[in-house]
């Protein structure tokens, strides 16, 4: 939904345009599920959007950069890219920059690292979807103790996610998610 809002804010009509998903590992069920969920939501929001074939890059940022740059150059109507982890996020941010497509191709990545954070600040990467690794670990330990002490634990826990963009990257709550050790 955030990407659609970004397109509208930039005056980009996504109808009939192209979109790309970069998959970090064909062997990872988590990444497969993440990508499938993302693509299904995009198709629900913009049914006429054309999904390019998912690109599998085996968690290689250099390969991701090259694939991103090549596909941007070959598809002038490509308006969005989703990278399903931080290494592919590094690659798409460098590929978008190398293709001179910052601000034209909206790039979102899952997870965050220093290169991606800088790319968001520089306006090359539109945003990142980040979790709360400290909170996830804390809750995991808490539920493990509860289970060992025969207390009831939830069957499922929504650990949440935050969309980080240039507009909120300096927010103290977002800073805590990006730099949990500080």
Label each residue range with its predicted role.
Residues 15-17, 48, 103-105:
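Short acidic capping loops at alpha-helix termini that bridge into adjacent secondary structure
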Residues 37-38, 53-119:
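Hydrophobic alpha-helical
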Residues 15-26, 30, 132-182:
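Hinge/cleft segment of the Venus flytrap/periplasmic-binding protein
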Residues 18-21, 42-58:
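Short beta-strand elements in bilobed, periplasmic/extracellular small-molecule ligand-binding domains
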Residues 16, 77-78, 125:
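Local beta-strand N-terminus motif with an aromatic residue
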Residues 1-20:
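A conserved helix-loop-strand patch within extracytoplasmic ligand-binding domains
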Residues 127-129:
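Paired acidic/hydrophobic, glycine-rich loop segments that form the ligand-binding mouth/hinge
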Residues 2, 29-49, 67, 91, ...:
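Short, solvent-exposed amphipathic alpha-helices that sit
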């Amino acid at each position: 939904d955030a990407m659609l809002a970004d397109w509208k804010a930039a005056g980009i009509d996504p109808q009939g345009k192209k979109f790309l998903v970069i998959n970090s590992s064909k062997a990872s069920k988590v990444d497969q599920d993440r990508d499938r969920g993302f693509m299904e939501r995009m198709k629900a929001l913009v049914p006429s959007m054309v999904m390019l074939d998912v690109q599998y890059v085996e968690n290689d940022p250099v390969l991701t950069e090259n694939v991103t740059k090549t596909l941007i150059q070959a598809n002038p109507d490509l308006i969005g890219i989703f990278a399903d982890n931080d290494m592919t996020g590094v690659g798409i941010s460098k590929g978008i920059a190398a293709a001179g497509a910052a601000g034209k191709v909206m790039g979102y990545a899952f997870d965050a690292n220093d290169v991606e954070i800088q790319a968001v600040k520089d306006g090359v990467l539109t945003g990142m979807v980040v979790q709360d690794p400290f909170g996830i670990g804390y809750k995991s330990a808490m539920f493990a103790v509860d289970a060992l002490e025969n207390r009831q634990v939830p069957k499922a826990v929504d650990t949440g996610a935050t969309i980080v963009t240039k507009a909120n990257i300096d927010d103290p709550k977002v800073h805590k998610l990006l730099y949990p050790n500080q």
